[in-house]
């Protein structure tokens, strides 16, 4: 179920204040965050946000196509190690 339009998108307050401060100064810095549930807003375009994936911070460069998505979508939490290739001893 989608979030109500009257509430607006969720963005962590500390993240939004850091982005607005960098925009006011005209700087581009990596912003570390643990807030995977925050929605990407147009103010964040051009910034690099390091999103925590449970083990480390994954740098995510925000582009125009990402607006409206959540930060956690771009920092995968699971690493896929491929299926075993050459184990044929169980076959006859």
UniProtKB/Swiss-Prot annotation:
**Pfam families to which the protein is assigned, alphabetical:** Ribosomal_S19 (PF00203)
* Residue ranges crossing the lipid bilayer per the database entry: none
Q: Name one GO cellular component term.
A: small ribosomal subunit
Answer whether the UniProt record assigns the keyword RNA-binding to this protein.
Answer: yes
Q: Which GO terms describe its biological process?
A: ribosomal small subunit assembly; translation
Keywords in alphabetical order, please: Ribonucleoprotein, Ribosomal protein, RNA-binding, rRNA-binding
Provide the GO MF annotations for this entry: rRNA binding; structural constituent of ribosome
Classification via InterPro entries: Ribosomal_uS19, Ribosomal_uS19_bac-type, Ribosomal_uS19_CS, Ribosomal_uS19_SF
Could you tell me the superkingdom of the organism this chain comes from? Bacteria
Q: What does this chain do?
A: Protein S19 forms a complex with S13 that binds strongly to the 16S ribosomal RNA.
What family is this? Belongs to the universal ribosomal protein uS19 family.
What NCBIfam families does this protein map onto? Answer: rpsS_bact
The protein here is known as: Small ribosomal subunit protein uS19
- Species lineage: Bacteria, Bacillati, Cyanobacteriota, Cyanophyceae, Gomontiellales
């Amino acid at each position: 179920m989608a979030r109500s339009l009257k509430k607006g998108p969720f963005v962590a307050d500390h993240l939004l204040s850091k982005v607005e401060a960098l925009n006011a100064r005209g700087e581009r810095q990596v912003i570390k965050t643990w807030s995977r549930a925050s929605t990407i807003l147009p103010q964040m375009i051009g910034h690099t946000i390091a999103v925590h994936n449970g083990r480390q911070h994954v740098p995510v460069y925000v582009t125009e196509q990402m607006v409206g998505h959540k930060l956690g979508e771009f920092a995968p939490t699971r690493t896929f190690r491929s299926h075993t290739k050459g184990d044929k001893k169980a076959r006859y």
